[in-house]
């Protein structure tokens, strides 16, 4: 059983809300830096004052308790202040993926029911393109370096408002005092397996996500936490900004993830801990080795999921590593600690807070060693999603048989370690065998000429599916399909060796580095796809 850290239990019961955390920090650490940027430092008090000014401006704009407000902003201090301002009002934050456009963007805007969006000026053209499709939006607040719009101008049926008009001079605001069951946000999932869904997030849900990361990284008040993730994503907002506030630590706010700049930024700010998605850790690991790789300030890194070379990663960069498994809907029910049992685990269940079962298609529990869908139940109220926004039918389907169905295939071993196998939609059924796309990807990525790869199912001629891999070579490399198959023949069972290969310069991804496999599945086989069977290249049986 995983034991949670008592130090992170400061905000118990009804105090597990953003409002209580900020109020506490203003008393005990008001002048301490909460956020560091390339241009300055911002204390807890600085951001609270800015949040008060913005809360007064939003109230004047007509925003009230329970209203949804869209934030489509790049990483900036104003994003954090607006998040706090909306919480002060009791309004509901709806972060927008900054890469959304077209119908995907208009769907999210309309589905949220928001009347107000605050958007960076660089996204104004995208909003303009779909403005005629907006059903409820009445106000667009434009923020950024571009010339601000004339107040009262129109975007479709919505009025344009300069950011300066909501930035009042009054820093004082009588904040709403929420409870853990009050709604804080609607977080739209990143859409790696289909259209985005709005997850209803309570204060308790967001708090527990952030508090859990404190345990996973052993975050202390003295820590400087650097994780180059976008604030519109839960990992950027809760696992970093919110976690350091609960711990009383300091966070570094980056713009975007850059493998080339990562270590220099860590050294610049003396960062001691970080959170890396597996794709980010993989790119860091695949950078050319340098003599000073271990000469950095990082001590602890949370990598989700682990890279197969995690032990080499730890030694090369001189860090401890832990991992977890989770998602927007179900939070993070597992912890590994820094003593990793192996390079494939995603931790053990935190039995104080969650129940997790591995089940078959009829929700019957499966024994250790057998992969199935992971289903979750909380032991404490309000720490997983309250449902899907405006889609009760999706909520009922997700919570069938009184368990939250995650859509993730996991497997448990006899010692209670859990292993991520695949997304249920990414699992491939070929000739009676279930194939993990992630396992095939790991072997392809081990080829010295490969930077990264995505493996997807495509329809077979008769029944079931075939394996297709989209491969991104390393710069300057041009691996032959036949050579890659020969490499995989020695590393994979015959039925897992891809039939189809396609080489690409890049893979479609979310801003947090997750490969958007649904886009690859929809595209499927193309004119550029190489067919192993047509080329008469055999596999070893």
Predicted segments — roles?
Residues 10-15, 31-76, 80-84, 101-106, ...:
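Conserved AMP-binding/adenylate-forming core of the ANL superfamily
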Residues 31, 158-161, 167-188, 195, ...:
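Conserved pre-ATP/AMP-binding loop-to-beta segment of ANL
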Residues 38, 56, 60-61, 84, ...:
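Structural core segment of the AMP-binding/adenylate-forming
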Residues 68, 74-94, 98-102, 107-116, ...:
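A short helix-loop-beta submotif of the ANL/AMP-binding
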Residues 100, 106, 117-119, 356, ...:
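AMP-binding/adenylate-forming catalytic core of the ANL superfamily
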Residues 143, 493-514, 533-541:
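AMP-binding/adenylate-forming catalytic domain of the ANL superfamily
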Residues 207-224, 232-272, 281-283, 287:
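Conserved AMP-binding/adenylation subdomain of ANL enzymes
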Residues 263, 268-276, 285-343, 354-355, ...:
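Gly/Ser/Thr-rich phosphate-binding loop
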């Amino acid at each position: 059983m995983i034991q949670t850290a008592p130090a992170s239990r400061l905000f118990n019961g009804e105090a597990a809300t953003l409002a209580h955390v900020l109020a506490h920090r203003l008393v005990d650490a008001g002048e301490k830096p909460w956020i560091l940027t390339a241009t300055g430092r911002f204390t807890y008090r600085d951001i609270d004052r800015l949040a008060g000014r913005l809360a007064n401006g939003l109230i004047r704009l007509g925003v009230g308790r329970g209203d949804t407000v869209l934030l489509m902003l790049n990483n900036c201090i104003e994003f954090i202040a607006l998040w706090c301002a909306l919480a002060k009002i009791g309004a509901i934050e709806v972060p927008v993926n900054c890469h959304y456009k077209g119908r995907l963007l208009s769907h999210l805007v309309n589905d949220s029911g928001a009347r107000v969006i605050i958007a960076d000026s660089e996204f104004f053209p995208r909003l303009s393109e779909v403005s005629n499709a907006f059903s409820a939006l009445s106000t667009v607040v434009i923020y950024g370096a571009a010339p601000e719009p004339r107040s009262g101008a129109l975007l479709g049926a919505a009025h344009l408002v300069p950011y300066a008009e909501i930035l009042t001079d009054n820093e004082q605001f009588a904040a709403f005092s929420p409870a853990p069951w009050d709604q804080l946000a609607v977080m739209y999932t990143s859409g790696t397996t289909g259209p985005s869904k709005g997850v209803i997030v309570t204060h308790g849900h967001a708090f527990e996500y952030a508090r859990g990361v404190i345990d996973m990284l052993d975050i202390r008040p003295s820590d400087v936490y650097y994780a180059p993730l976008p604030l519109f994503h839960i990992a950027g907002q809760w696992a970093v900004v919110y976690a350091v506030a609960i711990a009383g630590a300091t966070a570094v706010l980056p713009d975007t993830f850059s493998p080339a700049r990562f270590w220099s930024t860590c050294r610049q700010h003396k960062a001691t801990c970080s959170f890396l998605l597996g794709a980010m850790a993989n790119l860091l690991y695949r950078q050319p080795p340098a003599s000073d790789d271990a000469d950095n300030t990082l001590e602890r890194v949370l990598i989700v999921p682990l890279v197969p070379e995690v032990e080499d990663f730890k030694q090369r960069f001189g860090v401890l590593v832990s991992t977890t498994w989770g998602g927007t809907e179900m939070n993070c029910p597992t912890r590994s600690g820094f003593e990793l049992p192996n390079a494939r685990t995603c931790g053990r269940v935190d039995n104080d807070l969650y129940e997790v079962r591995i089940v078959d298609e009829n929700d019957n529990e499966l024994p250790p060693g057998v992969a199935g869908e992971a289903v979750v139940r909380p032991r404490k109220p309000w720490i997983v999603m309250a449902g899907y926004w405006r889609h009760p039918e999706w909520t009922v389907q997700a919570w069938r048989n009184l368990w939250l169905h995650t859509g993730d295939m996991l497997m448990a071993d006899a010692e209670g370690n859990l292993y991520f196998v695949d997304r249920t939609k990414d699992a491939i059924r070929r000739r009676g065998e279930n194939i993990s796309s992630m396992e095939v990807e790991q072997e392809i990525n081990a080829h010295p000429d490969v930077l990264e790869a995505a493996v997807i199912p495509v329809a077979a001629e008769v029944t079931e599916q075939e394996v297709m891999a989209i491969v991104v070579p390393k710069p300057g490399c041009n691996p032959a399909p036949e050579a890659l198959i020969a490499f995989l023949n020695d590393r994979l069972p015959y039925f897992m060796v891809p039939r189809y290969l396609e080489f690409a310069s890049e893979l479609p991804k979310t801003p947090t580095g997750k490969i958007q496999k649904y886009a690859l599945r929809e595209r499927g086989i193309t004119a550029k796809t190489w067919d192993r069977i047509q080329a008469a290249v055999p596999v070893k049986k």
